[in-house]
Design a protein with these regions (language model features):
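Extreme N-terminal tail/first-helix region
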Residues: 1-16, 138-139
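Short, catalytically relevant binding-site loops at active-site mouths
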Residues: 34, 49-51, 70-72, 117
Length: 139
């Protein structure tokens, strides 16, 4: 993955993610995330009772965005991604709690979105500059 994408995803903390609901329709949710830069995963906390986690029975495939909140056109940056969501393993949980240490007291379930394909748009690199990435070892 391009180092500029890694730097951006490490800097940010809020993702908008879309799952598929029981009627086959898109269902969007937002979540704080930690980025696993070794395995290229977004790690987030969510309850088994949440709608989006329940919808994983329909499809583990998700899509989403991470975007810088700015009104300055020259600073616009963001990622559009597709991935596969599953329960996080122990090392991924450690990464999440290293970033959001205060969440550990609530002992939330941590989920991992394995990034499979993404497009990074950055006006910082040049107006409308896009960098695409795709995982070579597809799930």
């Amino acid at each position: 993955m391009d180092e500029r994408i890694v730097k951006f995803l490490k800097k940010m903390h809020l993702a908008s993610v879309c799952a598929i609901d029981d009627e086959g329709q898109p269902y969007a949710f937002s979540a704080f995330y930690a980025f696993d830069e070794v395995n290229f995963c977004l790690l987030l906390a969510s309850s088994d009772d949440s709608s989006h986690v329940k919808f994983l029975k329909n499809s583990k495939f998700v899509a989403g965005t991470v975007a810088l909140d700015t009104k300055i056109v020259g600073k616009i940056e963001g990622v559009q991604f597709q991935g596969v969501m599953r329960e996080a393993n122990a090392s991924e949980r450690e990464i999440y709690f290293k970033r959001f240490f205060y969440a550990k007291v609530m002992d939330p379930k941590i989920w991992s979105i394995s990034l499979e394909k993404l497009k990074f748009t950055s006006n910082v690199l040049g107006f409308g500059k896009k960098i695409k990435w795709e995982r070579s070892d597809k799930i």
